[in-house]
């Protein structure tokens, strides 16, 4: 396509852009710059002539951040928390993206005008450790700051900075919004933030999952932090982050003390620096002053809540985050209504740590038993309850993990089972009021319903359709068939799906950016080399020093594969230092290849198109068989297909609607050629590549088929060619709004094809039994 045609196409398809500037760089790559932040892909490792945009737009959510006094905010819990930060007079916000708190970062990244008006500094931190260290701005100055990340993985990374922060204490409010990634929707190890909060004496809030409470706890969290000179964690679970609701907004507040004022009036207090003898004094201060101050604040501001009747023979104590599931279970048991009115006394811990002994004792006094609803293990609070009650000589029995699971998410059915068992032991008179439930037996007995278990097979998680990481592991499987199995260390990211069928690649995963580091022990003389996989996000997060630097320094001889998809794809498509897009707020286009060479690696290869399976295979083979010592590093680059589709589909649709000639590609399988051995499926695993039955009597097995979800990446055909499979794949070019030339070419092709078919039929041998 000529430059003039490209210019015309993008002027027609890029929205809200009046000024486009086009040019050709020294590498013959198309350059497109405009007000929307679109730029050509530099030769830092990607294909020529393609364009990429910075992260997805959250313009609508940004408008919600501008709501003022009396206006009603409607949306998700995590967005309500974001709004609450601005209402609280926060001065700076940092963090590292990850479910379930990514939206907080995403929205603020697009809210430049709002933040500038308020004088709020925002940045995407390089890691959770960086984010935690950012809170040091609140140590010496009365500045309110907030950071966020996914826990517990993120908290582990941030541990060093958090320990120092909590030891010296803070002057300004320091709030840490923790996405408690626990339960059925989790993607990490199942641990609790509670343990870390206790270890470092950081106050832990666990608010009820409704928007007014979330907003209030953000505001009170800053106050609690300042009143006790202690950082505060605000723990929000997956379902809390995504719960929908509304609250009455307030005006956003400008910081009462700005970062600029701090810079222009520096101060220091050596007693807040973690260095003996101050560190000993800080430990004493934690227990003698900060703890009592926190207890008094929690009581005075009524941060914990009570619901239901004042008196009762039994009661339920729960973490705030467990409130919704507990209420639904009580409703199923006929002990609460749909409006939250409970006939059982409830004590809700919106502050999970520290506990207020007086409140707990007052709630438990006169009750036969209480049930402690505490998701996850160990049962820290249940143990504390027993200690509090025994010290006060209260004989109330404490139940908890004896009727509820030690681990796993406390969903409503789980809670219902545990509550029923608790009440059957301690208050049987409360049972028997369950409302009638629909009888599902008739539905489940329907043969059509039973058949669903056979016609809908289980489908494990895997790569998206067209994912550029799929051909990497297809190539790895081919090399494995040729050179034998190798020890492969995996890493955190989309590429971790390689451990599942059909690839079954990867033995361990130790942490973000630690794939190569986890293969360190295998740096021994052997006929085989270890292979490590790491993503571009993990590379910049922790991998450059901890993995690549370590491998270079210790002269490792293994192979490291860096998957470069241009984004932090697994967390929502955020930009990272090596992203190809022009980002007006950050410095992107930093080459991974230059970085690994800069740290001392010498055997470095880059593949600009991962869909070239043959090249991927040959490069992997070369790395595994090279005579050169030292780490072998392969950077495999192609844009995340999910982000690419988000970017190109609106432009494509707009071009078609405008009547422009627009071309797309699809792939298919020639039914006459396909042998039905399905090797292509085993080496690809693409969800759009499936099977279908054929009427050909000479074929016993169903043939391969590509459905309408195909995005035209070409991986199936590349795999078939590289692995020398049957040549049954074909590529179809679909032209929307074809030109006169397109129509003439199509007409001519059809005539030529018809002539060949006629010629073939004329020479066909017809037997008597042939109905033709």
Protein language model features and the residues they cover:
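Flexible, low-complexity linker and terminal segments
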Residues: 25-35, 46-78, 82, 208-469, ...
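Thiamine diphosphate
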Residues: 33-35, 45-210, 239, 309-313, 499-633, 641-646, ...
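Short acidic, glycine/serine/threonine-rich loops at helix termini
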Residues: 104-107, 134-137, 157-161, 184-192, ...
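A glycine-rich helix N-cap at a beta->alpha junction
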Residues: 115-124, 167-178, 262, 553-564, ...
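Conserved thiamine diphosphate
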Residues: 181-231, 237, 265-274, 278, ...
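Intrinsic disorder at enzyme termini
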Residues: 660-670, 723-772
């Amino acid at each position: 396509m000529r430059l003039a045609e490209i210019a015309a196409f993008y002027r027609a398809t890029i929205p809200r852009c009046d000024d486009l500037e086009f040019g050709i760089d020294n590498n013959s790559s198309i350059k497109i710059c405009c007000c929307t932040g679109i730029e050509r892909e530099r030769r830092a490792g990607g294909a020529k002539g393609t364009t990429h945009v910075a992260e997805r737009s959250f313009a609508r959510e940004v408008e919600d951040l501008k709501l003022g006094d009396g206006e009603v905010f409607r949306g998700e819990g995590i967005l309500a928390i974001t709004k609450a930060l601005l209402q609280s007079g926060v001065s700076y916000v940092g963090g590292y993206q990850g479910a379930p708190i990514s939206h907080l970062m995403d929205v603020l990244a697009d809210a430049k005008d709002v933040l500038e008006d308020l004088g709020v500094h925002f940045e995407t931190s390089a890691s959770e450790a960086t984010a935690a260290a950012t809170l040091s701005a609140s140590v010496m100055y009365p500045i309110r700051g907030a950071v966020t990340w996914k826990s517990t993985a993120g908290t582990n990374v941030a541990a060093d900075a958090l320990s120092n922060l909590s030891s010296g204490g803070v002057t300004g409010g320091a709030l840490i919004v923790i996405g408690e990634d626990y339960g059925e929707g989790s993607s990490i190890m199942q641990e609790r933030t509670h343990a870390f909060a206790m270890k470092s004496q950081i106050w832990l809030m666990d608010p009820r999952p409704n928007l007014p409470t979330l907003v209030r706890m953000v505001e009170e969290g800053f106050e609690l932090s300042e009143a006790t000179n202690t950082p505060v964690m605000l723990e929000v679970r997956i379902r809390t982050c995504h719960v929908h609701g509304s609250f009455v907004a307030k005006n956003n507040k400008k910081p009462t003390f700005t970062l600029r004022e701090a810079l222009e009036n520096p101060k220091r207090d050596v007693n807040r620096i973690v260095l003996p003898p101050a560190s000993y004094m800080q430990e004493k201060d934690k227990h003698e002053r900060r703890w009592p101050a926190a207890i008094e604040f929690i009581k005075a501001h009524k941060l914990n809540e009570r619901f239901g009747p004042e008196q009762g023979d039994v009661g339920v104590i729960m973490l705030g985050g467990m409130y919704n599931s507990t209420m639904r279970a009580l409703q199923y048991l006929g002990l609460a209504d749909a409006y939250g009115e409970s006939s059982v006394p409830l004590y809700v811990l919106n502050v999970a740590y520290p506990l207020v002994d007086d409140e707990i004792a007052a709630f438990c006094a006169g009750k036969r038993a209480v049930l402690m609803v505490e998701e996850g293990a160990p049962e820290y609070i249940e143990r504390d309850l027993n200690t509090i009650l025994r010290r006060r000589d209260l004989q109330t029995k404490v139940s908890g993990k004896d009727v509820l699971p030690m681990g796993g998410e406390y969903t409503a059915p789980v809670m219902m089972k545990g509550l029923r068992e608790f009440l059957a032991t301690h208050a049987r008179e409360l049972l028997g009021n369950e409302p009638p439930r629909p009888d599902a037996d008739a539905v489940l007995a329907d043969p059509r319903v039973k058949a669903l278990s056979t016609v809908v097979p289980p489908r494990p998680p895997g790569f998206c359709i067209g994912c550029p990481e799929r051909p990497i592991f297809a190539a790895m499987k081919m090399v494995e068939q040729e050179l034998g199995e190798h020890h492969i260390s995996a890493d955190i990211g989309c590429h971790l799906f390689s451990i599942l069928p059909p690839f079954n690649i990867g033995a361990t995963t130790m942490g973000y950016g630690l794939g190569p580091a986890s293969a360190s022990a295998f740096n021994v003389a052997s006929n085989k080399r270890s292979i490590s996989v790491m993503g571009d996000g993990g590379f910049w997060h922790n991998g450059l020093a901890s993995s690549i630097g370590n491998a270079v320094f210790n002269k490792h001889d293994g192979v490291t594969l860096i998957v470069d998809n241009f984004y932090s794809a697994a967390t929502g498509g955020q930009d990272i230092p090596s992203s190809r897009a022009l980002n007006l707020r950050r410095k992107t286009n930093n080459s991974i290849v230059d970085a690994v060479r800069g740290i001392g690696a010498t055997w470095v290869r880059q593949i600009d198109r991962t869909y070239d399976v043959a090249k991927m295979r040959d490069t992997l083979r070369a790395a595994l068989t090279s005579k050169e010592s030292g780490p072998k590093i392969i950077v495999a680059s192609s844009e995340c297909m999910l982000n690419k589709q988000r970017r190109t589909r609106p432009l494509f649709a707009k071009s078609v609607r405008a009547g422009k000639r627009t071309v797309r590609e699809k792939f298919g399988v020639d039914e006459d050629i396909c042998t039905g051995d399905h090797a292509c499926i085993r080496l690809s695993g693409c969800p759009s590549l499936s099977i279908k039955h054929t009427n050909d009597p000479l074929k016993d097995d169903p043939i391969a088929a590509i459905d309408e979800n195909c995005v035209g990446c070409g991986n199936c055909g590349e795999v078939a060619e590289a692995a020398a499979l049957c040549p049954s794949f074909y590529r179809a070019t679909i032209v929307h709004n074809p030109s006169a030339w397109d129509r003439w070419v199509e007409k001519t092709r059809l005539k030529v094809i018809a002539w060949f078919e006629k010629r073939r039929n004329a020479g066909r041998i017809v037997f008597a039994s042939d109905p033709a």
